[in-house]
Every structure is written in C-alpha cells, then in structure tokens.
Amino acid sequence: MAYTALELITRAYYLSQVISRELQVPSGTQITDGLYLLNAIIDFKNSDLREIPYYQEFVFNAVQGQEKYDIPGLLTVDSLTFNIGPVRYAMNEETRTSYFANYRIDNVQSLPFQYRVERTLDGADIYIYFVPADVYVMKLWGKFQLTEAALTTDLTQFYDLFYIEFLRHQLAVWICSEYGASVPDLVKENYEILQKKIMDVSPPDLSIRSLNYFGNDPGLDWQIINLSGGWLPY
C-alpha cells in the first residue's frame, strides 16, 4: 500500500496539533511548508549518519593509472574491496594525514591496498593507492544520501514503515518549531524513543583487525604487494 509524502505531511500536522484532525485539512502554504521541512529533514540526515539505517553496495571499475574516483551520493564507506577474477582483496582505510601527508612514491602502479574517502558536494571522492595497474572491479559498502520527496512520492519505495513513522514524528516537531507552537509532551517522548531505536538498527562495524609483524601471519607492506603481486596464502 502506497504511503505518499502528502499523506505523511498531513499526518504530521495532525500529530503536531498545529491543526485539528476533525476540523481542518492542511492545504496551500501549509503543504508547501511541510514538503520543504520534510526534505530539509531528509537532507540534514546526511550530516548525522547514525539516523540513516541503510547500507548499500556500490560497484565501480578502477581505471589503470587513476587514483581519484567520484561517487555520487556517497556519504561514508564501511569497506572497500576489489576483485581479480574470483579472488577478492581487502583494502585499508587511511586517515587524511596518513594518506595525503605521509611519505610515499607517487604513481606506482600495482595492486591497491589503501584508500581515503573525502566528502564533496552531493557525494564523495575515493582515493586509492597504489594506483591501479589494471582495470579492477571495486566493491564498496557504505551509506548514501536519502531520496528527497515530491508530494506524490511513494515513500515505501525507499523507506521502511518504521522509518516513515520516525520521519512523521520528526516532521511534527519541526512543524511546531516553524509555527512557534509547543511540541506536545507525548510527541516529544515518542520521537526521542524512535530516534534511539533508529540508531540501533544498523550500527557501524567497530571491530578492529590488527596486523602483527612479529607473529606467524605476514603483515601487508610495500614489499609483499610488489614482490608477491598481492597473492598471499590466507
């Protein structure tokens, strides 16, 4: 069953108690304001990734000799790998200082093993090193920008019903702020409960994998990458 943005806006107005459910129907400026606020909420979530519960896979081809790749709509990357045939290789994310300010030999073409993600307008740039020596199929898992809505947009095509309910409560809070009204206590309480639950839907992977240069397993360094061609007996 479709759940349009117009229906969400209408229900948010009733929830905010700015208009009466039995006596009024939002129209005109109220609908325009509601759509603006809804899209402002959706856009603002790009700055607080904890409130975006959806991870997506994105596949692109690395180009021989190219370090930088523009990924539209990308917000953050959890993992980045590449394939040579059926064999998958992992890559390590570097800090900005480590990637851009550390010593290294530029333009070395080999198997990439490091990457750095930098946010840009409406997306992100991914930098990889070593510069690819061939065309590799890159696979990333990350979070992308949420889809903005028109009045007729069926929100169930993009969001779960629990997330739509969260948006309805948040929109009700913003409507109260826009119209100078007090947020009903129960609405505020339910919104805070929903917000906490949303952050627990898909928490980030905070596990740590360490490389031990003094243990039984080999560490990943420049010599291994270049001398072995990246083929390790894992």
What are these regions (language model features)?
Residues 1-234:
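Glycine-enriched, solvent-exposed interface loops adjoining structured elements
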